[in-house]
């Protein structure tokens, strides 16, 4: 008589963890960094339509790496949860902690009960009235949730990018300085730059997805920085002679106001309220 196949629960959990980590490691890195006026999202993402970064609610943002179809479904579920809770109770009852806990429960249930875990890693960020009240929640494939200070890094090169940020990050940086530090950290490990493939020293605007949660904006704090608004900030880095590995310098505070040519951000007078879904998105499939 043939003995039935058996695997211990510990072995099953190890196999699931290894499978999920391999999927996440193929994704390009994302950095979420706090700065003086809010929270900055920086992602290496050459796609202009499949986003890694999006808005969940008035002052709450979302970033992810991994399998696009899986975390896009989580993003949509988060938007719906926030809208229903805000409509049923009060908009102030929608917090980053509430959404992070809901994500943690879903990820944990899938990891323990389903054969295949989600190959995703998430960050839920909430901008507060002051820098001390900003919140960054990091969620992993098994439902673990951690409240991170200062910054969160996700993706295949997360450890190397985190080490670079720990060396150069300063609390209270302006937008331009925070962007410089984040792009430098991502560029140092990217195969698209000179460090990996003989390309430019820093990632270009076409290779980046950048957005902010600006605490000074009324109602909806989320705003994307792209095109004509992003290029001057990156060009300023090259003019200052910033290259990967160079010691940083403290820049003057640069207010995060929209620049000419920037797409209409959520909450702008010229952009109508679209009910919490406009400007949100997911990531391109992992490569």
Curated annotation (Swiss-Prot):
Cellular compartments per GO CC: cytoplasm; proteasome core complex, alpha-subunit complex
Pathway annotation: Protein degradation; proteasomal Pup-dependent pathway
GO function terms (MF aspect): threonine-type endopeptidase activity
Disordered: annotated segments: 241-287
GO biological process: modification-dependent protein catabolic process; proteasomal protein catabolic process
The entry's keywords: Cytoplasm, Proteasome
Similarity remark: Belongs to the peptidase T1A family.
NCBIfam families documented for this protein: 20S_bact_alpha
Name of the protein this chain belongs to: Proteasome subunit alpha
Lineage of producing organism: Bacteria, Bacillati, Actinomycetota, Actinomycetes, Geodermatophilales
Gene assigned in the entry: prcA
